[in-house]
From Swiss-Prot:
Family that this chain belongs to: Belongs to the universal ribosomal protein uS3 family.
A GO cellular-component term linked to this record: cytosolic small ribosomal subunit
HAMAP family in the cross-refs: Ribosomal_uS3_B (MF_01309_B)
Purpose: Binds the lower part of the 30S subunit head. Binds mRNA in the 70S ribosome, positioning it for translation.
Gene: rpsC
Source species of the chain: Myxococcus xanthus (strain DK1622)
Alphabetical list of InterPro entries matching this protein: KH_dom, KH_dom-like_a/b, KH_dom_type_2, KH_sf_prok-type, Ribosomal_S3_C_sf, Ribosomal_uS3_bac-typ, Ribosomal_uS3_C, Ribosomal_uS3_CS
Protein name: Small ribosomal subunit protein uS3
KH type-2 domain boundaries: 38-106
Species classification: Bacteria, Pseudomonadati, Myxococcota, Myxococcia, Myxococcales
PROSITE patterns, A to Z: KH_TYPE_2 (PS50823), RIBOSOMAL_S3 (PS00548)
Length: 220
């Protein structure tokens, strides 16, 4: 069932960690809704900056928001003016003090979320879906990905009947828990309706044990 389950959720606590790092008994629902609103706002207001993910950490009366972006200069702005504006806007979603941290995504070409959003943008510009998908595969492999799988579903090319098409290059082992699989999803809003774009990127294996080698199985 590795092909059905969410690749990041499947690896939580093994090689992946949570995007929201906090624990709460009483105000769980309130904090959860705050996190959702913060993420939606950051994605919407910084959609031109290539936001990959938003991590939220909470401690005492402080909220630390880590924004992973491919274009940190656009977010920061002149002399940090952009950060202050976003920080001020985020303060309306929570009573606690907000700290904003910008993290640069070094290789946007191998970031699954950014690749999915790039394909969706191309589909909205009426670029042929096969061309957009194959270009994403070639670029990711060129920038060091071990494997990549891209899938699009919906009324592809304006067809009468919706269908599902996918392409893969390299290896994408979804069942292997030590495999570092990045996953991203985006929707293209076309005149024919929505088209879903899913991307899986394999960045190699996270091997446990000393010297970066996996423990050898016993011969029992």
């Amino acid at each position: 069932m590795g092909q059905k389950v969410h690749p990041i959720g499947f690896r939580l606590g093994v090689i992946k960690t949570w995007d929201s790092k906090w624990f709460e008994h009483k105000n769980y629902a309130q904090w959860l809704h705050e996190d959702i609103r913060i993420r939606e706002f950051v994605k919407k207001s910084l959609n031109h900056a290539g936001v990959s993910k938003v991590e939220i950490e909470r401690a005492a009366n402080k909220v630390k928001v880590n924004v992973h972006t491919a274009r940190p200069g656009i977010v920061i702005g002149k002399r940090g003016a952009g950060i202050e504006t976003v920080k001020k806007d985020l303060q309306q979603f929570t009573k606690n003090e907000v700290f904003l941290n910008i993290v640069e995504v070094r290789k946007a070409e191998t970031d699954a979320q950014l690749v999915a959003e790039n394909i969706a943008t191309q589909l909205e510009r009426r670029i042929a879906f096969r061309r957009a998908m194959k270009k994403a595969l070639q670029t990711a492999m060129k920038f060091g990905a071990k494997g990549i799988r891209v899938a699009c579903s919906g009324r592809l090319g304006g067809a009468e009947m919706a269908r599902y098409e996918w392409y893969r290059e390299g290896r994408v082992p979804l069942h292997t828990l030590r495999a570092d699989i990045d996953y991203g999803f985006a929707e293209a809003k076309t005149t024919y309706g929505k088209i879903g774009c899913k991307v899986w990127v394999c960045k190699g294996e996270v091997l446990p044990g000393k010297g970066g080698q996996a423990p050898m199985p016993s011969n029992r």
